[in-house]
A protein has these predicted regions:
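Peripheral, non-AAA+ core regions of ATP-driven protein-machinery
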Residues: 1-225, 232, 236, 270, ...
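Basic, amphipathic alpha-helical bundle interface domains used for macromolecular binding and assembly
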Residues: 34-45, 60, 67-77, 293-296, ...
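Active-site phosphate-binding and catalytic loops of NTP-dependent enzymes
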Residues: 53-62, 92-100, 226, 249, ...
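Short loop/turn elements that form and flank the Walker-type P-loop nucleotide-binding site
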Residues: 59-62, 96-97, 129-130, 219-221, ...
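Residues immediately C-terminal
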Residues: 108, 309, 316-317
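Conserved alpha-helical scaffold flanking the Walker A/P-loop in AAA+ ATPase domains
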Residues: 215, 269, 274, 282-309
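Walker A/P-loop
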Residues: 224-265, 331
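Walker B catalytic acidic pair
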Residues: 228, 306, 312-314, 324
């Protein structure tokens, strides 16, 4: 009889189900693992044999063949130890292991070690196989217990896993764990946020227009570029935006944790949306991601999914990187294709850029002379193509900073966050599945209702500035967010006027 327990391996960022099969034949004693198993799985033979013998199990004097199916799929990870050990320990018992999954690296004493790399696999299994029963390390219970629709049995030792399989009446652990974060409830769904502001907008002096643009961008996930002289507060404003972004659903928190684990970062839960800030010298693969068949890694763009991607000194990024941004900015996905592999990442993020007006930075200064020649200014401006700029919703030229300026509007991060929460509620009450800045054409028609005055103003702007269809949709979406910040059901003339004022006209 061939017994089977299921496990999984990560392939191109997705969990692929693996059937772990075992047969025992009368022949010279041997222990063979087949099915494109890498060295970490091959080394399981020593760990499993020692763990069984140290727990009073007689290792069978037979030829043991472990097959990992499908055989053409490369597999890796020490978490295959547990299913292999269970199949060997239960060789003489006829048990039905249908829909049973087991994950865990064994110590030589049989204890199951923590392994946060299992998390992305469990997350995918919960979605694709809602009836699956999973045995996982007790040490990772705090991390795994939040995954919805997952029947999980947490064990500390190999013997506990064995007992669970031999006693099917044992119930899965009930997960009552809740995240210790602030919440709001909308449409019977909880959203999590933080009311701790490590950086506060009240510290920003002057720059009322830029602060308002930051508020609108945060509330609707609208792409933003701030342009101004060095030291005027561009980065200061953008670094504070991360603390006023909209709250997250549980699924978004889980997805962000999955991405961090895949990129070999920490596995903690956070009530803040991800904030990625790559340096201008970063390589193309580090920003776009790797599509290597063996170890694909998400890049900065993928890690910013559902969060914020900040490019400081925007024109100094490589031209091919800036042009590669056009697809994820427009379609909210990034496809990386190679000869032997292809991987797709979700990329619904808020893009924010900061730039000087010229190479020396003094073009907009009222006190310093610009040292650039006209040709240099033109070359600098041309680093950002028109198709790229057309994907930017909000463009602000900031005034030169003045030490004597008082904090503008007396806006604090807490106040701005409350307005963002108000706009977020308006969007969710309309049953929107996406932020205003990410609405498609059909959703724009449905949710972006203009009154007569706003419609007339938009038509005049289209005729005067020759706006593209993309630009028109961008203006409508920004106006929708401005209306939400004012708790207005329809887009009015004042909202449209403000949205047009933030549009970069060629």
């Amino acid at each position: 009889m061939i017994n089977t327990i299921f496990c999984a391996t990560m392939q191109r960022g997705v969990a692929e189900i693996v059937a772990v099969e075992a047969t025992f034949t009368r022949a010279l004693p041997a222990f063979v693992i087949s099915g494109l198993a890498n060295s970490s799985i091959q080394e399981a033979k020593q760990r499993v044999q020692s763990a069984l013998q140290n727990n009073d199990f007689t290792f069978p004097p037979l030829k043991i063949t472990i097959n990992l199916s499908p055989s053409d799929l490369p597999k890796s990870g020490s978490h295959f130890d547990l299913p292999i050990a269970l199949l060997i320990a239960l060789q003489k018992q006829e048990l039905a292991f249908k829909e049973w999954f087991a994950f865990g690296e064994l110590g030589l004493d049989g204890k199951i070690k923590p392994n946060s790399n299992i998390f992305p696999m469990l997350l995918d299994i919960a979605i694709k196989h809602p009836h699956a029963k999973v045995i996982a390390p007790k040490a990772n219970e705090e991390l795994f217990a939040l995954i919805p629709n997952l029947q999980c049995f947490f064990v500390e030792h190999f013997k506990e896993a064995l007992e669970i399989l031999q006693n099917p009446e044992i119930k899965a652990d009930t997960h009552t764990k809740k995240l210790p974060f602030k919440t709001i409830e909308l449409n019977d769904k909880e959203y999590y946020f933080s009311d701790a502001y490590a950086l506060d907008f009240k510290e920003v002096k002057g720059q009322a227009v830029a602060k308002e643009a930051a508020l609108i961008a945060s509330a609707g996930f609208h792409n933003l570029i701030l342009e101004g002289s060095p030291g005027c507060g561009k980065s200061m404003i953008i670094n504070r935006m991360r603390y006023i972004l909209p709250p997250l659903s549980l699924n978004e928190i889980l997805e962000a944790t999955k991405l961090r684990i895949l990129s070999e970062q920490d596995s903690a839960y956070y009530p803040l949306r991800s904030f990625r800030n790559p340096h201008q010298s970063a390589s193309k693969s580090s920003i776009l991601g790797s599509s290597s068949l063996k170890e694909p890694k998400p890049g900065e763009i993928a890690l910013a999914h559902n969060g914020m991607l900040f490019f400081d000194e925007l024109p100094h990024f490589k031209k091919d990187i800036l042009e590669a941004l056009r697809e994820p900015l427009e379609n909210n996905k990034l496809v990386i294709s190679r000869v032997h592999s292809k991987i797709e990442y979700e990329t619904s993020f808020l893009f924010v850029g900061a730039q000087n007006p010229c190479l020396c930075g003094n073009l907009l200064s009222a006190t310093k002379a610009c040292r650039c020649q006209d040709r240099e200014i033109t070359q600098y401006k041309n680093r950002l193509s028109e198709p790229f700029l057309d994907r930017i919703d909000l463009f602000v030229q900031m005034e030169e900073g003045n030490y004597k300026d008082t904090p503008s509007h007396s806006w604090t991060s807490k106040e701005m966050h409350q307005w963002v929460l108000l706009a977020f509620k308006q969007q969710k009450l309309r049953k929107q599945s996406a932020f205003n800045g990410k609405l498609n054409e059909e959703q724009i028609e449905r949710f972006c209702s203009l009154n007569a005055e706003a419609q007339k103003l938009l038509e005049q702007a289209i005729e005067r500035f020759n706006l593209s269809m993309r630009s028109v949709n961008k203006v409508k979406k920004v106006a929708r967010t401005i209306a939400d910040l004012n708790a207005c059901e329809n887009i009015e003339k004042s909202h449209m006027l403000k949205a047009l004022s933030f549009r970069k006209i060629s």
